[in-house]
Amino acid sequence: FLDAVAEFLAAEADSFPPVETLFMLEPSLVTDAPDDGEDERASEAIDTVADAIDADVVVHTYWGSIPEKPYAHLMDADVDAIGFDFVADHQGSVYNIQEYGTKDEIALGVVDGQNTLVETPEEIAERVEWVHEQVPAEGFETVYVSSNTELFYLPTNKAEAKLEALAAGATEVSL
């Protein structure tokens, strides 16, 4: 079944118009982490999708931090960046980065995608700077500043306001 889902998603990704970056939202690595043996297969399934598109690929997890073993297999996946949920579990996300490292590119989920309260650009910049302070040894080629989850379920006006705040907050970051 996992292989069939991966093949289906790979076909979907292959049919996209040209894009620069593909975000693969993957909460199940946190909420229903694969068992031993299945964690490696999950990484291979991610590879199948990532290989189907000529774009940077970000696997963005949320609703917590990834358990250690699935995280290790995700690090082996052929993706450009891993996304972390710094709203639901900032300490666990920092622990994974400090303990196991991460890719050369990173996505920071610093805006709450499940709440209609719109963060200010200053709050967003502070959160990005906080992450940088926690992992100063990591030098990232690209930092994606994003919501911790998709914004799909928010009212349109709130989702758009959060996107505007993200754009403004990213310009205020001083590293």
Kindly give the residue locations of the regions a language model identified:
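Catalytic-face loop-and-helix region of soluble metabolic enzyme cores
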Residues: 77-172
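Active-site loop segments of alpha/beta catalytic cores
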Residues: 1-92, 101
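Terminal disorder- and signal-encoded targeting elements
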Residues: 18, 48, 52, 137, ...
